[in-house]
Amino acid sequence: MSKYLLVVFWFFASMAHAQTPVVFVLAAGDNVVVTNPKGQRYSALPTQRLLFGHQIDVPKGQRFSVLVLKTGNRRVFTGPANLTVIADTIRLLNGPAAKVFPLAQEDLDMVDQWIKLYARPRGSAPGSAKARPEDGGELDVIHPVDGSLLLTRTPQFVFKGDLPREGNLMLFDSKGKRFWVEPIESEYVSFPPAAKFEWGQRFTWEVRRLTGGRVLSGSFNIASEETARALLEARIPDLPSTLPESLLFYGMRLQMAGAYKEADDVWASLGISLTLNGQPTRLR
């Protein structure tokens, strides 16, 4: 009986290892490839979580940077190198030794929050969800994404798809009172100076046909002046000398604050976009 219990314990312990993230990808060269335990191969991308059994191939001259979640250390590998993820770290099979750096506690906390916020459903493959709805006739909003935090007092809307004939964009304040109505004449909608937006305001919005039928709806918040200033002043310049890890952490900070427009600019500078559930895909 004790032998049977030991086998059961070993089985469930192995399952736990197989489902628990071991490393968090911070940066990867364009040609770095991950192979999962099922033999599926895909590009290594920032924000991916790698589990026990993943293999990584780093070609010559390519760079691969990860956070080892158990130790809190950043490890940077330079190709040619072959790596494997074991129970609690990433192991170098062959290639130059990794360079090891500590990470600031605020960055570790942010990664922990990110993993909890964007936990990938079991069984889904990276990049399997769509970053944005496919092109088609149905009306959709590109900006502001529902729930966005705006870092400006001059909101602008960008739509895609079939615009309603003689449609209106209607804004409502936090009490549900109508704030502004703007005709939709193109995919780009801005507001005149008479629409006085203030820091810290919350809005819901609707696109309505002239006949009154609602086509689309959403919400956005304008940041407080202090929050907007803090996020904008923390901006990391996209220079050749800038570490991609620094851009990543700034993008994560913006994303978790809800400043999706600014975060998208950072993701683009890293050559990626995020799916609706926070998974990375490479920009083509």
Please annotate each region the language model reported.
Residues 1-4:
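Positively charged n-region of N-terminal signal peptides that target proteins for export
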Residues 13-15:
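N-terminal signal peptide c-region/cleavage motif recognized by signal peptidases
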Residues 19-155, 247:
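Flexible, surface-exposed loop/linker segments and immediately adjacent secondary-structure boundaries
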Residues 94-113, 231-268:
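Compositionally biased low-complexity segments at domain edges in trafficked proteins
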